[in-house]
Amino acid sequence: MKIGIYPGSFDPVTLGHLDVIRRSAKIMDELVIGVLANSSKTPLFTVEERVKLLECVVKDIPNVKVVAFDGLTVDFAKKLGAKFLIRGLRAITDFEYELQIAQTNHKLDEEIDTVFFTTSVEYSYLSSSIVKEIASYGGDISKFVPNSIIQVIYDKYNGKRSE
């Protein structure tokens, strides 16, 4: 059975992430979206919120599940019996960084291989950081995130403003 892990912070999940999820789910028997709990970034959403948002947007993909984790991705993969790590590449700068990580992960566990997906052209510029920047000013994020989570993102910023 081919089990893949797509790790990330997904803060928030974007249409670019969803594109990689849908495409990678086609080549894996099971795809686990690993939501990083101890990211070095300060998240907008808690890990629990990010898991719920992802579950909402992938509910129509039967072989995908969402799990929070912390620690090394290779240890998480080993625990789940996964042999493949999924990564999306937007630009050559992504490739340089992701290649280093992929080679390091392979050194840590030689049974782990990284599968790279180049981002579809319409999402090649997109990042969660861009979405957060636009949303923080009340801009239109409907072209960047799944419709089902747009209001949740705006609500998060409205709540931050009223605190």
Curated annotation (Swiss-Prot):
Keyword Repeat attributed: no
Cofactor: Mg(2+)
GO cellular component: cytoplasm
A GO BP entry: coenzyme A biosynthetic process
SUPFAM superfamilies: Nucleotidylyl transferase
InterPro entries (alphabetical): Cyt_trans-like (IPR004821), PPAT (IPR001980), Rossmann-like_a/b/a_fold (IPR014729)
Pfam hit, one: CTP_transf_like
Annotated positions for site Transition state stabilizer: 17
EC number: 2.7.7.3
GO MF terms, alphabetically ordered: ATP binding; pantetheine-phosphate adenylyltransferase activity
Gene3D superfamilies in UniProt: HUPs
Localization terms from the record: Cytoplasm
Keyword Magnesium found: yes
UniProt KW keywords: ATP-binding, Coenzyme A biosynthesis, Cytoplasm, Magnesium, Nucleotide-binding, Nucleotidyltransferase, Transferase
Pathway in which the depicted protein is active: Cofactor biosynthesis; coenzyme A biosynthesis; CoA from (R)-pantothenate: step 4/5
Catalysed reactions listed for this entry: (R)-4'-phosphopantetheine + ATP + H(+) = 3'-dephospho-CoA + diphosphate
Binding site for substrate: 9, 41, 73, 87
Function: Reversibly transfers an adenylyl group from ATP to 4'-phosphopantetheine, yielding dephospho-CoA (dPCoA) and pyrophosphate.
Entry's family note: Belongs to the bacterial CoaD family.
SUBUNIT field: Homohexamer.
Protein name: Phosphopantetheine adenylyltransferase
